[in-house]
């Protein structure tokens, strides 16, 4: 293993500067942050060097500057580098802020990163101001007086601060410069945790894989970020029901990873809808099988670059144990850049923790939209032979998850666990009304494909039924 990844200190540096998660198709607009870091390093090094020879005394300042320019080795270069880098610092920081405002860097989950960046800007201006007001600096006496007196606007204590020696003490100790550096370090820590305002690629993608993928059809990374979280929650529910993440071994012992959503051919419109939003994956149709099917297959590169980063960005995850385990395994392989199948460990850490009890499922912000996706794969709306309306969800044993359905639909109906399957079903008038209210909620992702048609027909049959005719139905569209 390389020293960068084994040494305790170098491992930290490597994770921040070399292996930090960043998009593979990042633009030049994301260079301003690294350029500003270079400017900060230059300012600190040249500033400390100048401070060794500069005297802030009015009587000695001019002579100390001449000493730097004439006697210090390359002193003229250090002085001009310090002053010109200061100008470049502000020029780049305004471009950096403009890029952040244009791409929405102030939005969650990077709100705190943006707030710390604002603090850095204020400290940066304060530090620059202290440099300008030094004897033989670039600011006039009256200009410095006006800016200093801004502090007097602070209620109750402002005037005392201006008249006291506190500001002089701060200048002499270079306190603001020290605080500025500390805040910058904290800013980079937050940026490492919350990523930049673009989708980070998970792990390392080989250049050959990037060449093979058809990027011409893809959206811009910023457009992917704008995809509603309701759609991603719907997709997670659909995958939990009728999808799987397949990790297989190639003939040469390498790892192959893909995500597959398999539906009946009549539900082809669902896959076409997903493909139209994500612009990734390939739809395959199998008409020769006993039960004609269609499959959306998303390859490893698209999982690393698009889908998994989107789920991580929106804090959406799979809620069935099987799918969660598959996701954790794939994420571990991506993050650790594992190439060979025999290098996969027996146990992998969980990226997200599945709720331990039913109530915790209902507290997840994406759970309602997840139910819609799960309904499109494992749900059904039908009329029984006795003309009772029924809504049903069915899958293999996931006890806590199905108990959460009871809480979400506010019903006391018992979960049927026959033949190692969980079955949640309601048919009473009050329960059917709750189901109608749930799927009629305006903020919910709609049902899609054949399940939507089934739901509309189900509503029409309920309206015509004597038993359910008095229920409140959504307006017909």
Curated annotation (Swiss-Prot):
One Pfam family of this chain: Cytochrome_B
MF terms (GO), sorted A to Z: electron transfer activity; endonuclease activity; oxidoreductase activity; RNA binding
Record-level GO cellular component terms: membrane; mitochondrial inner membrane; respiratory chain complex III
Keyword Lipid metabolism: no
Function statement: Mitochondrial mRNA maturase required for splicing of intron 3 of the cytochrome b (cob) gene, containing its own coding sequence.
Main location: mitochondrion
Gene that specifies this protein: bI3
CDD domains membership: Cytochrome_b_N (cd00284)
UniProt family annotation: In the N-terminal section; belongs to the cytochrome b family.
This protein's UniProt keywords: Membrane, Mitochondrion, Mitochondrion inner membrane, mRNA processing, mRNA splicing, RNA-binding, Transmembrane, Transmembrane helix
Transmembrane intervals: 32-52, 86-106, 113-133, 142-162, 166-186
InterPro entries: Cyt_b/b6_N, Cytb/b6-like_sf, Cytochrome_b_N_euk/bac, Di-haem_cyt_TM, Homing_endonucl, LAGLIDADG_dom
Miscellaneous comment: Encoded from partially processed cob mRNA that terminates with the in-frame coding sequence of the third intron.
Region (Maturase): 164-477
Keyword Disulfide bond annotated: no
Organism in which the protein naturally occurs: Neurospora crassa (strain ATCC 24698 / 74-OR23-1A / CBS 708.71 / DSM 1257 / FGSC 987)
Protein name as it appears in the record: Cytochrome b mRNA maturase bI3
GO biological process, one term: proton transmembrane transport
Domain of life: Eukaryota
Annotated segments matching region Cytochrome b: 1-163
Chain segments annotated as coiled-coil in the UniProt record: none
């Amino acid at each position: 293993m390389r020293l960068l990844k084994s040494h305790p200190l170098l491992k930290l540096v490597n994770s921040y500067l070399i292996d930090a998660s960043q998009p593979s198709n990042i633009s030049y607009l994301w260079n301003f942050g690294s350029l500003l870091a270079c400017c900060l390093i230059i300012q600190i090094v040249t500033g400390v060097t100048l401070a060794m020879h500069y005297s802030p005394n009015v009587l000695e300042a001019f002579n100390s500057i001449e000493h730097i320019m004439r006697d210090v080795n390359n002193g003229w270069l250090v002085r001009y580098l310090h002053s010109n880098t200061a100008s470049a610092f502000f020029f780049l920081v305004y471009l950096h802020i403009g890029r952040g405002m244009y791409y929405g860097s102030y939005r969650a989950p990077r709100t705190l990163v943006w707030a710390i960046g604002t603090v850095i800007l204020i400290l940066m201006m304060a530090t620059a101001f202290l440099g300008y007001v030094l004897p033989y600096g670039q600011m006039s006496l009256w200009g410095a007086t006006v800016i200093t007196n801004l502090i007097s606007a602070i209620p109750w204590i402002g005037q005392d601060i201006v008249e006291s020696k506190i500001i002089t003490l701060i200048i002499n100790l270079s306190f603001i410069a020290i605080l500025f550096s500390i805040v910058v370090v904290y800013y980079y820590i937050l940026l490492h945790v919350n990523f930049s305002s673009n989708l980070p690629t998970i792990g390392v993608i080989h250049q050959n894989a990037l060449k093979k993928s058809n990027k011409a059809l893809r959206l811009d990374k910023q457009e992917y970020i704008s995809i509603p979280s309701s759609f991603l929650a719907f997709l997670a529910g659909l995958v939990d029901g009728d999808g799987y993440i397949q990790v297989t071994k190639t003939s040469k012992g390498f790892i192959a990873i893909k995500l597959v959503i398999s539906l009946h051919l009549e539900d082809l419109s669902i896959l076409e809808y997903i493909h139209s939003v994500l612009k990734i994956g390939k739809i395959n149709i199998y008409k020769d099988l006993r039960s004609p099917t269609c499959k959306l297959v998303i390859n490893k590169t698209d999982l690393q670059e698009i889908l998994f980063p989107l789920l991580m960005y929106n804090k959406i995850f799979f809620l069935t144990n099987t799918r969660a385990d598959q996701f954790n395994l794939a994420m571990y392989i991506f993050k650790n850049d594992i190439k060979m199948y025999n290098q996969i460990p027996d146990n992998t850490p969980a990226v997200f923790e599945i709720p331990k009890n039913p109530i915790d499922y209902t507290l997840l912000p994406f759970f309602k939209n997840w139910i819609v996706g799960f309904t499109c794969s494992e749900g059904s709306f039908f009329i029984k032979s006795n003309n009772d309306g029924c809504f049903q969800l069915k899958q293999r044993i996931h006890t806590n998850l199905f108990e959460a359905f009871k809480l979400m639909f506010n019903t006391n109906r018992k979960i049927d666990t026959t033949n190692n399957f969980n079955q949640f079903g309601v048919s009473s008038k009050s329960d059917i009304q709750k189901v109608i209210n749930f799927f009629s909620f305006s903020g919910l992702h709609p049902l899609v494909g054949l399940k939507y048609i089934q739901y509309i027909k189900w509503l029409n049959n309920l309206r015509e039924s004597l038993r359910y005719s008095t229920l409140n139905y959504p307006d017909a569209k």
